[in-house]
Amino acid sequence: MKILFIVPYVPNLVRVRPYNMIRSLAERGHQVTVLTLWTNEAEQSDIEHLREFCDVVHTIHMPGWRSLWNCAQVLPTRDPLQSVYSWQPALVEPFLNDASYDVVHVEHLRGARYGLHFKQHSNIPVVWDSVDCITHLFRQASAQSTDRLRRWRSRLDLKRTERYEGWLVNQFDRVLVTSPTDKQILTSLSENGSTPPIEVIPNGVALQYFYPDTAVSREA
């Protein structure tokens, strides 16, 4: 398959979910084009590493001021700040009319707008990897965080995110999440009680790096 993989941050060994997905797809013989945003020069080495196994890696600089400007524009609306934080249309414009791709894969709530853009301007199937249910994370942070600023930010965006995620899960050909809990909560948010096309794909574990050390004694 020829896959257009859109990530609103540079995949690396810290942002392991998109990194492992991209690498695994490439190892299986798929042609993967990665579109991603970078925010600082330190990420250039990660970008060069992606080029070792991706067909194409297309990047755009995303300065912090632009993310803040995006958020300021939606503050008076009902849309969550996360939905526009990483919005940079120049990232995808060169690819909108390329019908050679079999599927578009977009990651995270911050990347979902790119998927919506493709749904509006092309006929290519779009998969959205929500990763986590952000509503669930905001509910936890607003109730449990000891950081007052974090609690305030979570409460500010919570209702917007609940409504938006409930609408968003029905906009794509397939939705992916990391855990059954995230699937359950996203499904409960779905507009009009519809059943969205959500699949659970857990984060993988590289067994060549993570395995029991037989030299270390364990408690029975």
Residue ranges and their predicted role:
Residues H136-Q140, T187, V205-E219:
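Acidic anion/phosphate-binding donor-loop and adjacent secondary structure
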Residues L35-L96:
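A conserved catalytic-core segment of Leloir-type glycosyltransferases
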Residues G64-Q82, P125-G166:
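Acceptor-binding helix/loop patch of EC 2.4 sugar-transfer enzymes
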Residues H108, S130-D132, S179-P180:
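Helix N-cap/beta->alpha junction signal
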Residues P94-A112, P125-V127:
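Short N-terminal targeting/anchoring amphipathic segment
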Residues V104-H105, N170-S179:
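A short beta-strand/loop micro-motif in the catalytic core of glycosyltransferases
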Residues T181, G204:
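Carbohydrate-associated surface elements
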